[in-house]
Curated annotation (Swiss-Prot):
Subcellular location: Cytoplasm
Gene3D superfamilies, A to Z: 3.40.50.1400
Reaction(s) this enzyme catalyzes, per UniProt: heme b + 2 H(+) = protoporphyrin IX + Fe(2+)
Catalytic activity, EC: 4.98.1.1
Domain of life: Bacteria
Functional pathway: Porphyrin-containing compound metabolism; protoheme biosynthesis; protoheme from protoporphyrin-IX: step 1/1
Annotated protein name in UniProt: Ferrochelatase
Organism encoding this protein: Azotobacter vinelandii (strain DJ / ATCC BAA-1303)
Length: 338
């Protein structure tokens, strides 16, 4: 092996679906100022209120999707790590999580001990958001400063419109679409609207008009999560030859009372059923790995909601996970990260 390593970083998971482990994980996640962007005293107060009931509720959700080998997100991420290593001959491929175990610090220390000099950091998020990409990059830089490790760091930029990502998405999802469907819903993770405004380098473009995402100039597009989600959806639809009326975009996983980007997935599930859609396919392109937001929120609760509203079938299309096309594409993306 040579001295150029990859560090794949995903979100993370509790160690188990037990309430205590879920509480510990949620506390670390929600106290990240990039996730809840409030001053520390207010953030601490809000998170303490959330942790009164949320750990028990989330523990039940985690238990419903937990695998014999543990967290699906962790298990699938490990499989991806192994698959990418088969395509990356420049050095070792390491895996870390932003929250919970498999810390970024431990991964960087292992790489340094192996004699690695260069690291390409790959946040496993196709679209940019401070609460995903920025927090991974900043935590990695913090660890490097604090530890004194002299590793040359490169960062994989968001790859929402890169052909490698979209082609892998098409190859992974294609067989599921060929089974037939009435409608395809592309459900992306949501964000509070204030996060978009905060990330807008112009200070005035985001959410300024109904078509702001489609009209976003290059410098705004580079930091606008919603605009990037729409570009990903459109790129995928073109590759699959989907007519405009057969697919749509929504945003899931709202937390709290603040206004989040819309349309909301839970509202779209009811609306599509009311429109007469019987066989609904749902993809979650903001997630490269299946996790609680896909398997439980969409695959269980979303399915129940859609059927209760009059739909017949909701089929959750698996994420990219460790699909061979994705493993190859990710290695190629990391060779040209900028």
């Amino acid at each position: 092996m040579t001295d150029h390593a990859l560090l794949l970083v995903n979100l993370g998971s509790p160690d188990s679906p037990e309430v205590a482990d879920v509480r510990r994980y949620l506390d670390q996640f929600l106290m990240d100022p990039y996730v809840i962007d409030l001053p520390w005293p207010l953030r601490r107060l809000l998170v303490s209120l959330i942790l009164r009931k949320r750990p028990e509720q989330s523990a039940h959700a985690y238990a419903s999707i937990w695998w014999p080998e543990g967290s699906p997100l962790i298990a699938l991420s490990r499989r991806l790590q192994e698959a990418v290593q088969a395509h990356w001959h420049e050095g070792p491929v390491e895996l870390a999580m932003r929250y919970g175990n498999l810390s970024i610090e431990a991964a960087l220390n292992r790489l340094a001990e192996e004699g690695v000099r260069r690291v390409t950091l790959a946040p496993l998020y196709p679209q940019f958001a401070d609460s995903t990409v920025t927090t991974v990059v900043e935590e990695t830089r913090r660890v490097l400063r604090a530890s004194g490790l002299t590793l040359e760091l490169r960062v994989l930029e968001p790859f929402f419109a890169r052909p490698e990502y979209l082609d892998a998405l098409a190859r992974s999802a294609g067989p599921h679409l060929q089974q037939g469907f009435d409608h395809l819903l592309l459900s992306f993770h949501g964000l509070p609207e204030r996060h978009l405004r905060k990330a807008d380098p112009s200070g005035r473009h985001c959410l300024g008009s109904a078509d702001c995402c489609r009209e976003a100039p290059v410098e705004v597009l580079a930091r606008c999560y919603r605009a990037q989600c729409l570009r990903s959806a459109e790129g995928f639809a073109r590759r699959m030859g989907l007519d405009e009326g057969r697919w749509s975009v929504s945003f899931q996983s709202r937390l709290g009372r603040a206004r989040w980007i819309s349309p909301y997935t839970e509202e779209q599930l009811d609306a599509l059923a009311a429109r007469g859609v019987k066989r609904l396919l749902v993809m979650c392109p903001a997630f490269v790995t299946d996790c609680i937001e896909t398997l439980e929120e969409i695959g269980q609760r979303g399915r129940e909601q859609f059927q209760a509203a009059g739909g017949e079938e909701l089929i959750l299309v698996p994420c990219l996970n460790d699909h061979p096309a994705w493993a190859s594409a990710l290695a190629q993306l990391c060779r040209t990260p900028g």
